[in-house]
């Protein structure tokens, strides 16, 4: 028989840097889950990723105080900022408020990486989504 699910916890944690301090500790402590076990498991699961990369994780809490978790690909904004070589997006988006640029080939590469977790039918659809995200961040999209 399947375990009874008591809740889901969605967090964004830097790869390889899960520790019991906020936001991880309080979120898991509310459900009575073993915080240190999660930290060890998460850090082991993200061992092959770049340290510090933000990783969305969905933790499923069960009635017997056990858990399972699923890691997802980092947010689009992380990849876009990395491709453009900037620390943060524009604070004033619109015409003339560009803070960097990305090429279509970079967007296609990001789309292929993110395709698993994007709501798109094909890579071209994912690229169009990324173009919109890039423009809203103040990045100009150039051919190349």
Swiss-Prot record:
A single GO molecular function term of this UniProt record: large ribosomal subunit rRNA binding
A cellular component annotation (GO) from this entry: cytosolic large ribosomal subunit
Signal peptide (from-to): none
Keyword Repeat recorded: no
Keywords: Methylation, Ribonucleoprotein, Ribosomal protein, RNA-binding, rRNA-binding
InterPro entries from the UniProt entry: Ribosomal_uL11, Ribosomal_uL11_bac-typ, Ribosomal_uL11_C, Ribosomal_uL11_C_sf, Ribosomal_uL11_CS, Ribosomal_uL11_N, Ribosomal_uL11_N_sf
Biological process according to GO: translation
Domain of life: Bacteria
PTM per Swiss-Prot/TrEMBL: One or more lysine residues are methylated.
HAMAP family in the record: Ribosomal_uL11
Similarity section: Belongs to the universal ribosomal protein uL11 family.
Role played: Forms part of the ribosomal stalk which helps the ribosome interact with GTP-bound translation factors.
NCBIfam families: L11_bact (TIGR01632)
Assembly mode: Part of the ribosomal stalk of the 50S ribosomal subunit. Interacts with L10 and the large rRNA to form the base of the stalk. L10 forms an elongated spine to which L12 dimers bind in a sequential fashion forming a multimeric L10(L12)X complex.
The protein's name in its UniProt record: Large ribosomal subunit protein uL11
Taxonomic lineage from the root: Bacteria, Pseudomonadati, Pseudomonadota, Alphaproteobacteria, Acetobacterales
């Amino acid at each position: 028989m399947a375990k009874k699910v008591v809740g889901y916890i969605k967090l964004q944690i830097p790869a390889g840097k899960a520790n019991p301090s906020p936001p991880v500790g309080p979120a898991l402590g509310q459900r009575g889950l073993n915080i240190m076990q999660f930290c060890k498991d998460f850090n082991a699961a993200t061992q092959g990723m770049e340290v510090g990369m933000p990783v969305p994780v969905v933790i499923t809490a069960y009635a017997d105080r056990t858990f399972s978790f699923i890691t997802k690909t980092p947010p689009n904004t992380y990849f876009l900022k990395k491709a453009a070589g900037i620390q943060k997006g524009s604070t004033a988006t619109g015409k003339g408020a560009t803070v960097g640029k990305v090429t279509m080939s970079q967007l296609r590469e990001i789309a292929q990486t993110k395709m698993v977790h994007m709501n798109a039918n094909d890579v071209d659809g994912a690229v169009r989504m990324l173009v919109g995200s890039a423009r809203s961040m103040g990045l100009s999209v150039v051919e190349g």
